[in-house]
Design a protein with these regions (language model features):
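Structural/interface elements that position substrates and couple domains in central-metabolism enzymes
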Residues: 1-124
Length: 124
């Protein structure tokens, strides 16, 4: 995978947050969600992976609950997966060395530019 090849050393064993795990935006349906494959990828990389989704409280694929909004600032890698409307107003205080991966163009242009200036942002 492109992510593994480019960021292997940066992500191995890190704390990862998947942002948006439903199958489609603005729904709580997680059946056939692409987030499952992403979760499995980070599991193979020995990462401690959590998720945040204001619409999906419980994700049966991982048998876990979404973290709370107040706990978004404690991760090494942030992976944006689904473009929920509520994410337009989401402001995460990223750590200086955090890696931000936007796999579905979730972040709006002005946020992408602000984050990309920190040199830790990757959009695919």
């Amino acid at each position: 995978s492109e992510i593994r090849d480019k960021f292997n050393k940066k992500i191995f064993g890190k704390k990862v947050l998947l942002i948006g795990v439903s199958y489609r935006e603005d729904t709580n349906d997680t059946r056939y969600s692409p987030a499952e494959g992403v979760f499995d990828f980070f599991k193979k990389m020995k990462c401690k992976t959590s998720f945040y989704d204001p619409i999906v409280n419980y994700w049966d694929f991982t048998d876990s609950y979404s973290i709370e909004k107040k706990d978004l600032d404690n991760f090494d890698v942030y992976v944006y997966l689904i473009k929920h409307q509520s994410f337009k107003k989401l402001n995460i205080p990223y750590k200086k060395k955090s890696l931000i991966l936007d796999l579905n163009h979730v972040l709006e242009r002005n946020k992408r530019l602000r984050i990309s200036n920190s040199k830790n942002y990757k959009s695919t």
